[in-house]
Regions:
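Sec-dependent bacterial lipoprotein signal peptides
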Residues: 1-15
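Intrinsically disordered, low-complexity segments enriched in small/polar and acidic residues
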Residues: 25-29
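Electrostatic cytochrome c docking/interface patches
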Residues: 30-73
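The canonical Cys-X-X-Cys-His
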Residues: 70, 74-85, 105, 134, ...
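Gly/Gly-Pro-rich "capping" loops immediately C-terminal to redox-active cysteine motifs
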Residues: 71, 83-111
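Axial heme c-ligation environment in periplasmic c-type cytochrome domains
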Residues: 89-96, 114-143
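C-terminal capping alpha-helices of c-type cytochrome domains
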Residues: 103-108, 131-155
Length: 155
């Protein structure tokens, strides 16, 4: 019995006397290279996406009537997943037209399912946002155009 106690005591001393490793430093800084790879911040103004909209001309002056209509549709159909000014379930629409073409935005709104199957940027966003599917809201071109005008007003 005394040998067991002595063995236990010696074991404790041996393990306590070994040199301690310096604690690792943790850094919470966001690495710039990682953020540049994210689809939500990647800029591609040439990609028009897949869908019915192949060309759109935006007037220089924002149409305030269309903005109000787009805001109402956005609040009704989109705010479950998208928040103004912050990432939520889906990306924030702020500055979207600095990163995507108007055609791409409208095709994503109008033709969500096919965009997620065939458009590389839409696929990358799908992966970035943990595989959350954007629900096809079955909007028409006029409604999508109103939402686009609302997005222009957010810039």
């Amino acid at each position: 019995m005394i040998y067991r106690i002595a063995f236990l005591f010696l074991s404790l001393i041996i393990f306590q006397c070994r040199p301690k490793e310096a604690p690792k430093e943790f850094s919470f800084k966001k690495k710039e290279k990682e953020s540049l790879r994210k689809a939500s911040v990647f800029v591609d103004l040439k990609n028009k996406g897949v869908g019915p909209v192949s060309s759109i001309v935006l007037e220089e002056v924002i149409d305030s009537v269309l903005v109000r209509k787009g805001e109402a549709i956005y609040k009704e159909k989109c705010t479950v997943c998208h928040k103004i000014g912050s990432k939520f379930i889906g990306p924030s629409p702020n500055g979207i037209l600095k990163r995507r073409s108007p055609e791409w935005v409208m095709n994503m709104i109008l033709n969500t399912d096919e965009m997620l199957q065939k458009d590389s940027l839409a696929k990358a966003l799908f992966m970035e946002f943990d595989g959350q599917l954007m629900v096809n809201q079955k909007l028409n071109e006029e409604e999508a155009r109103a939402i686009l005008e609302y997005f222009r007003a957010l810039e």
